[in-house]
A protein has these predicted regions:
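Bacterial N-terminal signal peptides
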Residues: 7-17
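Non-catalytic cap/lid and distal C-terminal segments of serine-dependent acyl enzymes
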Residues: 21-271
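Positively charged n-region of N-terminal signal peptides that target proteins for export
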Residues: 1-6
Length: 271
C-alpha cells in the first residue's frame, strides 16, 4: 500500500548528537476512492529507530496539496525531532473540503482521513495507535476538514485544531468548489446545513476533544471562527480560542502552527 518515490534526509545537530528526521512522499491506497493518495510523512529520529511516537495530521487548504505545510514551515523536520512527533500531511484532492461527498461518490475524504490513513500510519510509520496520541489540524479548508473529521470521528482523534478555518461554509456558496460536492446552496440548504462544522458542534461534550482554534482578525473567515467560539461557549465545551493580528496567508500560518503544536504536545504529555 506504500511506495516511496522521494526521500529527503534532514540532518540536524542537536544537544545529544546528530539526528536525522526523515521526510517521505508516499502513495497510500484508498479503498473507498479506489485510488492512491499522495501523503507527505515526517518521522523523527526516534520513530526511525523503532520508538512509537504521537502523530499530528496536517491538512492543507483549497488549491494546495500535501506539500503545503512543509512550504509554510520548512523546519517541520527539526520540530519533529525536537518534539518527538510524527507529522502526516495528506493530499486533500485540491478542493475536497475533506467530506464524503453525497454527490461525487468517488470523493470519500472523510473516510480516507479518519479511517484509511490512520490505519496506514499506525501500521507503517511507528505512530502510537491510540486516539490520546493523535491530533489533527489544518489551515483554511484544512481547518474545516480537521474539525469536521475530529468531531465526527471522536474515536479516532483526541485533539483537534483549526487555523484560519472555514468553519461555517454557508456564507460562501460560490467559493472554493464546494457546490461541486454538496450542490448549490439555495437548492440544497439541508445538505449545506449538515456539511458545515458549526452545525456539528452539538456532537461535542466538554472534554471529549482537546480543541484549539485561531484566526487572524483581518481574515475573511474571522467572523465564522468567532461564531464557532461563541457557540462552543454556549455549549460549555472547553476550548482555546486565539484571535490576533493577521490575515489569510503563509505568514500567519507560519506563526500560528507553533501555538497549535505546543497545545498538542501538552495534550499528548498529560495522558
Amino acid at each position: 500500500m506504500k511506495r516511496a518515490f522521494s526521500t529527503i534526509y534532514i540532518c540536524l545537530l542537536a544537544f545529544l548528537g546528530l539526528q536525522a528526521a526523515q521526510v517521505d512522499t508516499l502513495l497510500v491506497h484508498s479503498e473507498s476512492m479506489n485510488k492512491d493518495i499522495k501523503v507527505l510523512a515526517i518521522r523523527p529520529d526516534k520513530a526511525l529507530k523503532g520508538e512509537q511516537c504521537p502523530v499530528i495530521y496536517l491538512l492543507h487548504g483549497c488549491t494546495d496539496n500535501h506539500e503545503k505545510w512543509l512550504k509554510v514551515r520548512p523546519d517541520l523536520p527539526e520540530i519533529a525531532d525536537r518534539e518527538g512527533i510524527i507529522f502526516v500531511c495528506p493530499d486533500g484532492g485540491y478542493d475536497s473540503w475533506y467530506w464524503d461527498s453525497p454527490i461525487v461518490k468517488e470523493y470519500c475524504y472523510e473516510t480516507f482521513i479518519s479511517k484509511e490513513l490512520i490505519a496506514y500510519t499506525d501500521a507503517n510509520l511507528s505512530s502510537i495507535p491510540d486516539r490520546s496520541k493523535r491530533a489533527i489540524t489544518g489551515l483554511s479548508m484544512g481547518g474545516h476538514g480537521a474539525m469536521w473529521n475530529a468531531i465526527r470521528n471522536q474515536d479516532a482523534f483526541g485533539a483537534v485544531g483549526s487555523t484560519s478555518g472555514g468553519l461555517d461554509i454557508r456564507p460562501f456558496p460560490n467559493n472554493w468548489g464546494m457546490k461541486k460536492y454538496i450542490g448549490e446552496r439555495d437548492e440544497n440548504l439541508y445538505v449545506w446545513n449538515n456539511h458545515t462544522v458549526i452545525n456539528q458542534l452539538d456532537r461535542l461534550k466538554d472534554g471529549a476533544l482537546a480543541i484549539i482554534i485561531d484566526c487572524g482578525i483581518s481574515d475573511f473567515f474571522y467572523g465564522v471562527n468567532k461564531a464557532v467560539h461563541e457557540r462552543l461557549l454556549q455549549l460549555k465545551v472547553g476550548h482555546d480560542f486565539i484571535a490576533r493580528p493577521g490575515g489569510h496567508n503563509d505568514t500567519y500560518w507560519n506563526n500560528s502552527i507553533d501555538y497549535q503544536i505546543k497545545f498538542f504536545k501538552k495534550y499528548f504529555e498529560k495522558e
